[in-house]
Structure formats: C-alpha cells, structure tokens
UniProtKB/Swiss-Prot annotation:
Tissues and organs where the protein is expressed, per its UniProt entry: Expressed ubiquitously with highest levels in dry seeds and in cells surrounding the base of trichomes and guard cells.
Residue ranges of domain G-patch in the record: 214-260
A GO term, aspect molecular function: RNA binding
Residue ranges with Basic and acidic residues bias: 103-158
UniProt main location, coarse: nucleus
Subunit structure: Component of the SWAP1-SFPS-RRC1 splicing factor complex which modulates pre-mRNA splicing to promote photomorphogenesis. Interacts with SWAP1 in a light-independent manner. Associates with the photoreceptor phytochrome B (phyB) in nuclear photobodies upon response to red light. Binds to the splicing factor 1 SF1, involved in 3' splicing site recognition.
Source species of the chain: Arabidopsis thaliana
Composition bias type Low complexity, residue spans: 19-29
Matches recorded under InterPro entries: G_patch_dom (IPR000467), Nucleotide-bd_a/b_plait_sf (IPR012677), RBD_domain_sf (IPR035979), RBM17 (IPR040052), RRM_dom (IPR000504), RRM_dom_euk (IPR003954), SPF45_RRM (IPR034653)
Protein name, per record: DNA-damage-repair/toleration protein 111
Entry keywords, A to Z: Abscisic acid signaling pathway, DNA damage, DNA repair, mRNA processing, mRNA splicing, Nucleus, RNA-binding, Stress response
Length: 387
C-alpha cells in the first residue's frame, strides 16, 4: 500500500540531503515517541519522596537500553526500577515501661498523691510491725511449749516429787538454803496446830489460808512471832485486833477506819439520817459545812454539781459565802442545789447529811423554793444561835 502511494516519486539524491546533523532530526522525532521509549535526560530532576531518619540510598533508575534488533514488530519493555533492589526503612519499636499514663481528662493532684504515698507507707510499716509481732509471739509460744515439755519430762522422770506436801517441800527448800547443815540451820516452821490459831476458819482476810489447807507465809511469820487469833499486835497485846479499812467519803477523798467501828458507825448513821428527815420536801437542797471560809474556788460549783448529779437532774447550783467577822465557821458557806423533782432532793439529803467531805461533816436540809427564786440566801434572824 505504501509502495503504491509513493511509488511515483523519484529517489532522493545527495544534493537533497540536509546539511544539518542527522541527530537533530532524530531528536525531534524522539519527542514524538511514546514515553516508554524516550531516553531519560542526563540530569534527572530531584525526586521528592519522604526519607526516613536513617537516610537510605536514593533509588536510581537504570539507563535505557534499546532492544536488540529483531524482525518482529513486537517490542519488549523493561521497567526502569527492575534491576534496582527496593530499599524500605526498617521501623524499630521502642518499648517503655509506663506505670500510669497521663490522662488529660483526669488531672493529677499533688496533695492527693502525697496522701496516697503516705498511706501506702503507713500500711507497709503496719504490716511489717504485725509480721514482727506475730513472729515474736510464735517464738515465745515455741519457747513456752519447750519449757512445758521439759518440765513434764522432769516430773515424769522423778515421780517421788509428787508425793510430798507443801510443808515438806518448804522444809526441804529451807534445808537446802541453810547449806545442808541439820544442826544449826534455818529453823523449820511451827506446826499447824498452834494454840489459839485456827487455820480452817480465820476471820482475818489479810492472812488467808494456803492451797490445800496449808499455812501461808504471812501466817507462819505471825505465828513465829507469837501471834494468836484474837490477840492484839505488839509485845503487850496493845495493838489493834481488827484490820483497817478504807472508807470512801467523796469521789476523790476517803478515810481509814477500823472494821468494827465502821459497821457500828454505819448503823448509827442510818438511824440519824432517818431522824433528820423532817418538813415538807422541796426541790432545793441546802448544804452547810462542806467547805470553810476562803475555800470557795471556781471548781467547787462543778464538783458539787457532778457529785449531786448521781441523785437526779441538777438544774442550778449557787454558792453563798458570808464574810462577816466572828461568824460561825460551819455556817459561813451555804451551797444551794436545785433538782428537777422533790424525790431527787430527798435522795440526796439522805445520802449527804452527815457525810464527811474534806474532814468536815456535811449538814443537808430542805430549803424554801420561793426564797431561792428570789435569791434570799442569807440566814434569817434566829436560824443560827448567836447571829
């Protein structure tokens, strides 16, 4: 077809050849070639790719090689980056041991952190202390068990020790402490059947009876000095025959009395108290001779209110002191206590009248409520003799 189209043209001659270089003709023709057949320029434009930190070598495309001549019209295309191995950056993972990651939604509090740290330290200290105590208790229990086992083994190995009484054991101990001398060693304890000395029923609580009916050390000592039951102490038996007892007179005070005298005084006091209750009961109680002139302080009101509070509800406490010269000392200080009910006042009067308070005998009587409400606290004429 091509031959038929251009067959009538004459062949080219040397004069018609262009004077220019043939490379320009080919260069212009190569511009029209496909992009895959174009020869890359000598200076390629810089490639804009994201390079990693380790800066790998850039990928350089291989120069274009023309395919070998062949009769077939098919052409083989070779990719430019086929010969160059692909280099990809290696990612190295960094692991970190983060205990608590920061959360912007929940801000931390320094004070709370300090309290939490202090609490954990306290708990750790308490745990160590408890472990230490538990270990000490276990060691102590272990030692006690070992000692009991050793004691049990000694008792089992010597059965004759269980067949002696307490008196014989005491004599043996006295003989051992005396150096083994039987002639002039320590004197043995007196027998239990001393004249006037009854071990079975002793009224004195200070001496008592030993285990198994044996005499105690106090009984042996007293019997050794010649004491007999019912006799007074001393060489001429002029001492006391009954023990001394402590009698409580106040919340912070007391006196020492004889046991028999205490019983008799208690009976007499009960009789006197029953006689002193006269007149119509009121809610106001008058206490006299509880303290002397000049002894009133700021704590006296609270002390009286607290002492009278065990009889009922105390609503008011007033202290009235008379400072006139030559006034009776036992009437100079008058303490008024108001209760909520007359029954409580009666109960307080029965317990406080005749009671000892700081070495003084307290006198308690009922007082008129109308006078107390009007603050008429001074004694009326004729109430106190000589006033």
């Amino acid at each position: 077809m091509l031959g038929g189209l251009y067959g009538d043209l004459p062949p080219p001659t040397d004069d018609e050849k262009p004077s220019g270089n043939s490379s320009s003709v080919w260069s212009s023709s190569t511009k029209m070639a496909p992009p895959t057949l174009r020869k890359p320029p000598a200076f390629a434009p810089p490639q804009t790719i994201l390079r990693p930190l380790n800066k790998p070598k850039p990928i350089v495309s291989a120069p274009y090689k023309p395919p070998p001549p062949s009769n077939s019209s098919q052409s083989v295309l070779i990719p430019a980056n086929e010969s160059a191995p692909s280099h990809q950056p290696a990612l190295v993972g960094v692991t970190s041991s983060v205990i608590e990651e920061y959360d912007p939604a929940r801000p931390n509090d320094y004070e709370e952190y300090k309290r939490e740290k202090k609490r954990k330290a306290t708990e750790a200290e308490m745990k160590r202390e408890m472990d230490k105590r538990r270990q000490e208790d276990e060691e102590r229990d272990k030692r006690e068990r070992e000692e009991r086992e050793k004691e049990r083994e000694r008792d089992n190995s010597d059965p004759s020790r269980l067949n002696i009484s307490g008196e014989e054991a005491w004599k043996r101990r006295a003989a051992m402490s005396g150096g083994g001398s039987g002639g002039k060693g320590r004197s043995s304890s007196p027998p239990g059947n001393v004249d006037g000395f009854s071990i079975g029923k002793s009224e004195t609580s200070g001496l008592g009876v030993g285990a198994g009916g044996q005499m105690t050390a106090a009984q042996r000592m007293m019997a050794k000095m010649g004491w007999k039951q019912g006799q007074g102490l001393g060489k001429s038996e002029q001492g006391i025959t009954t023990p001394l007892m402590a009698k409580k007179t106040d919340r912070r005070a007391g006196v020492i009395v004889n046991a028999s005298e205490n019983k008799s005084s208690s009976a007499e006091k009960k009789v006197v108290k029953s006689v002193n209750i006269n007149g119509e009961p009121t809610r106001v109680l008058l206490l006299r001779n509880m303290v002397g002139p000049g002894q009133v302080d700021d704590e006296l009101e609270d002390e009286v209110g607290g002492e009278c509070g065990k009889y009922g509800t105390v609503t008011r406490v007033l202290i009235f002191e008379i400072t006139e010269p030559n006034f009776p000392v036992h009437e100079a200080v008058r303490i008024f206590v108001q209760f909520s009910r007359p029954e409580e006042t009666t109960k307080a009067l029965v317990d406080l009248d005749g009671r000892y308070f700081g070495g003084r005998t307290v006198r308690a009587t009922f007082y008129d409520e109308e006078k107390f409400s009007k603050n008429e606290l001074a004694p009326v004429p004729g109430e106190i003799p000589g006033y």
